[in-house]
Amino acid sequence: MEEGKRWIAVPTWRVPGRMERWHSLIKYLKYRTGDLEKVCYVPHHKVGWAWWTCSRVIFPLKGESHLEIQAYWNLTPEKGWLSSYSVRLTWYTEKFWTDVTPDCADSLIHSTYFSCFTAGEVRRAIRGEKLLSCCNYPQAHKYQVPSLQFLALVVVQQNGRPQRDNTTRKQWRRNYRRGLRVARQDGRSHKQRGSEPPAPRAYFPGVAKVLEILA
């Protein structure tokens, strides 16, 4: 008796274009700034038994857990219900795994990587002092219910105060522009800017924004 085909279905997120921006940003933050030094980057490769190709970015998280973002090429767009490109977001431990949404992936990455406001920043903001830290991953807070303290710190970070030095604000803006610019360029362009000093902290636009994920 001939055995029928067995299919394994997994949820993926459609991506409208190619993945160079995503790969370029990951390589920049891993090899240039060191913000993602612990991240494992597996370049675009062929899967032996499949017709599609993929790449993998594995984020080690707290508590022996990991977040893996797999990007797929060459799916079946002729069917009408699949894009040529898509990504899969998976959180897993040694004994358990589950697929997550882009906003959940942002929160998981922010919990381990990229700085946020420290506990003493509220008191510094009330006293009109310079903020000593800032949130370099605001996209991770987009779908959360923020506290009044966090909202106030975001306003101070974005607008600044006349009586304090706005170095933190300027640095944040530079990192913001740098993060978006790097995400749109091919990784080879970084070699041409080898004389530039690395940023002390990079800004991460967010998984959905970089990949242009279509819900």
UniProtKB/Swiss-Prot annotation:
GO terms for cellular component: host cell cytoplasm; host cell plasma membrane; membrane; virion component. Residues 154-167 are annotated as: Multimerization. It is found in: Host cytoplasm; Host cell membrane; Virion. It is a peripheral membrane protein. The modification Phosphoserine is found at S147. It comes from the Viruses. Processed in virion by the viral protease. Highly phosphorylated on serine and threonine residues. GO terms for biological process: viral life cycle. The keyword Transferase does not apply. A motif (HCCH motif) lies at residues 110-141. The BC-like-box motif mediates the interaction with elongin BC complex. Homomultimer; in vitro and presumably in vivo. Interacts with viral Pr55Gag precursor and human APOBEC3G. The interaction between Vif and APOBEC3G is species-specific, which may play a role in restricting the replication of HIV to humans. Forms an E3 ligase complex by interacting with human CUL5 and elongin BC complex (ELOB and ELOC). Belongs to the primate lentivirus group Vif protein family. Counteracts the innate antiviral activity of APOBEC3G. Forms a complex with host APOBEC3G thus preventing the entry of this lethally hypermutating enzyme into progeny virions. Functions as an adapter molecule, recruiting APOBEC3G to the ubiquitin-proteasome machinery. Targets APOBEC3G for degradation through the assembly with elongin BC complex, CUL5 and RBX1. Binds viral RNA and affects the stability of viral nucleoprotein core. May play a role in viral morphology. This is Virion infectivity factor. It comes from Human immunodeficiency virus type 2 subtype A (isolate ST). The gene is vif.
